[in-house]
Amino acid sequence: MSTLNTRERTGAGLAGGSVLLVGGSVAASSMLTGYPVLGGQAVRYLAAGLLLAAWARLTHKPLPRPTGPEWAWLAGLAVIGLAGCSVLMIQATRVADPASVGVIIGAAPLVIIIAAAIAARRLPAGRVLLAAAVVTAGSAASQLGGATGPAFSAAGLAWSAGALAGAVGTSLLAAPLLPRLGALAVTVYACGLAGLLLLAAAAIARTAGGPPILAIPTPAQLAALAYLTVAVTAVVFIAWYGAMERLGVDRTGLFNGLIPITSLAAVALTGTGTITPLGLLAALAVLAGVILGLGRHRKSLPAPGRGHELSSASSTWMVRRDGNLPDSVMVSNSQ
């Protein structure tokens, strides 16, 4: 196994930092149980998009204008990966304990690698597939090792599976956009679209007798919304997409398995739970799987290079100038 080069080490650092921030979102989300879901998530994404757009303007970072087909991909990313995934995740935690949700979401590394391989019409790299299986098993074991263990229910399983599908959709739908638009532009446009969609949905729900679109947040809710907006949305999306550009789908996706581990650590640090011996062993297994998958190998799905072009909204993969198909996609948790 070869050592990582500078570019790959940067990608690993970006992915690892993203996981730490997302792990902290569990505590933040628990503070929003009494806050309007659709309106709150709309504010989160709109604010994140505006903050990043302002930052791009101040730093003179270009935001390329999307083409028609790219707008279609961005709309799908906003609906499925951002708005859909976040709302489904919240609904899952309302009807199921975090452990059971974590078991399902922990399968993300394995699902994304298999999905990417199927879409690219090739077999996944053997070592990365093995690493993904180790990460998935360790992630599930970390939840099984909790104080109470997961309590599965039909509703909880359905919501969790939907959230997992949304997370995988985030990867598959973002991949064709990154080479030309870049991580910053993709995040700005997708957050803006997701925020507008959620705001419209909140307004429709309100006219149908649903909850208010927004409410005056308590100090704790305001802090939670700020953390989710800045750290878990604006920072995480750019960092994760940057990691994917450097590591590729298979190796970046492995870091998703660390999210339940960081969540358990956050719970232990805040004194709201404990880590059992099984949970600790599971954490070590996940770490071993990530290290195994990070090693270079010939059959790794490559990160996208410049020179790709998106020919139509129905094209799942972009073709490089040399005629080869890039297979790089990623999965992001947008809790």
Where are these regions (language model features)?
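Glycine-/small-residue-enriched transmembrane alpha-helix faces in small-molecule transporters
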Residues: M1-V43, A48-L50, V87, Q91, ...
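Hydrophobic alpha-helical transmembrane segments of multi-pass integral membrane proteins
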Residues: R9-L14, G39-W55, G76, L130-A137, ...
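Helix-helix packing/entry segments at the starts of transmembrane helices
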Residues: A15-V19, A42-V43, L82, S86, ...
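Specific transmembrane alpha-helical segments of multi-pass solute transporters/efflux pumps
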Residues: L21-V26, A53-I105, A141, T229-L247
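Membrane-interface helix termini and inter-helical loops of multi-pass transporters
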Residues: A27-Y35, R94, Q143-A154, A205-A220, ...
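Hydrophobic/aromatic residues within transmembrane alpha-helices
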Residues: L32, G40, R44, A92, ...
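Specific alpha-helical transmembrane segments that line the substrate/conduction pathway
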Residues: G39-L50, G81, M89-L123, R127, ...
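Hydrophobic transmembrane alpha-helices of multi-pass small-molecule transport proteins
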Residues: L52, A115, P124-G146, G257-L258, ...
